[in-house]
Amino acid sequence: MLDPRLSVAPMVDRTDRHFRFLVRQVSLGVRLYTEMTVDQAVLRGNRERLLAFRPEEHPIALQLAGSDPKSLAEAARIGEAFGYDEINLNLGCPSEKAQEGGYGACLLLDLARVREILKAMGEAVRVPVTVKMRLGLEGKETYRGLAQSVEAMAEAGVKVFVVHARSALLALSTKANREIPPLRHDWVHRLKGDFPQLTFVTNGGIRSLEEALFHLKRVDGVMLGRAVYEDPFVLEEADRRVFGLPRRPSRLEVARRMRAYLEEEVLKGTPPWAVLRHMLNLFRGRPKGRLWRRLLSEGRSLQALDRALRLMEEEVGEEGEKEKPGPRGQREAAPGPAREGV
């Protein structure tokens, strides 16, 4: 059964396997999504590079984009074979590239095609096929139109709807589309009341766990995006307060785990910066956090991370962890729980 309560949004050039691994160290319960992946890339590209992920990343969803039912169905089959727990169809990307390719938000103009796509994908796989959509297009959305779109997709077998609670303005940039169209989370709340048999996840502009908890009283789930990338420890209390799991490790312990991960990845030929760039915000708002960023940005190596870690060990200590007497009476940090992501 898909647990929709809390998830991290698919973000292009952000939610790759390295960032997802980092997030999993902060929260065991949160649901992870890949970057948006076009169906043709799955069919013709390097599948191992595009789709491979570590077992620790579960639960994880593959987000696909495209406009051809057969191609998307085949891409969904491939994703399921790789072990993804969910296949999500992007109906929200407003970018010029998406419009040229006939996928993303512009597909909302052709609900008959959307239904055909979703039916084909649903018949191709056994895992849930879900959608991530906007309220509508060009600021002309109405609640009635949104509800009709949901009904049409539900008839095609979709049970889970992730709704970015904004319209898509196709003449604007992707960044502007995250900021200019007004948020209408109340429409998503209303959808849950009108379609109680369906699952609704609201998304857009949610910056804190407190905000997420507010919406969780009204809908089935909340998806956070940029806030998590800007500070992964927005999710610090998510396991305890949302999933009833023990509190996760401190920032310093997560940094140490990422150091071990980076060492392993470098041996596989991964450029260090591919991992380090996602770690820049790990100490956001903390003492010496800016120096941490600078050391990683300038050094871009395992050695640079080691220097930054030594700095944080001296300046921050074992944040959030109890201390116990050392062998000679000095104070030392008690070891954190030896839990790894599952």
UniProtKB/Swiss-Prot annotation:
Compositional bias (Basic and acidic residues): 313-331
Active site, UniProt feature: 93 (proton donor)
Pfam families: Dus
Enzyme class: oxidoreductase
Origin: domain of life: Bacteria
Catalytic activity: 5,6-dihydrouridine(20) in tRNA + NADP(+) = uridine(20) in tRNA + NADPH + H(+); 5,6-dihydrouridine(20) in tRNA + NAD(+) = uridine(20) in tRNA + NADH + H(+); 5,6-dihydrouridine(20a) in tRNA + NADP(+) = uridine(20a) in tRNA + NADPH + H(+); 5,6-dihydrouridine(20a) in tRNA + NAD(+) = uridine(20a) in tRNA + NADH + H(+)
Residues the entry annotates as binding FMN: 10-12, 63, 132, 164, 203-205, 225-226
Any single biological process term in GO: tRNA dihydrouridine synthesis
EC number(s) recorded for this UniProt protein: 1.3.1.-, 1.3.1.91
Keyword tRNA-binding: yes
Site feature location: Interacts with tRNA: 90, 97, 175, 178, 290, 293
This protein's UniProt keywords: Flavoprotein, FMN, NADP, Nucleotide-binding, Oxidoreductase, RNA-binding, tRNA processing, tRNA-binding
Cofactor: FMN
Region span, Disordered: 313-342
Molecular function terms, GO-annotated: flavin adenine dinucleotide binding; FMN binding; tRNA binding; tRNA dihydrouridine synthase activity; tRNA-dihydrouridine20 synthase activity; tRNA-dihydrouridine20a synthase activity
Function in brief: Catalyzes the synthesis of 5,6-dihydrouridine (D), a modified base found in the D-loop of most tRNAs, via the reduction of the C5-C6 double bond in target uridines. Specifically modifies U20 and U20a in tRNAs.
Family: Belongs to the Dus family. DusA subfamily.
PANTHER family given in the database record: FMN-LINKED OXIDOREDUCTASES SUPERFAMILY PROTEIN (PTHR42907:SF1)
Protein name: tRNA-dihydrouridine(20/20a) synthase
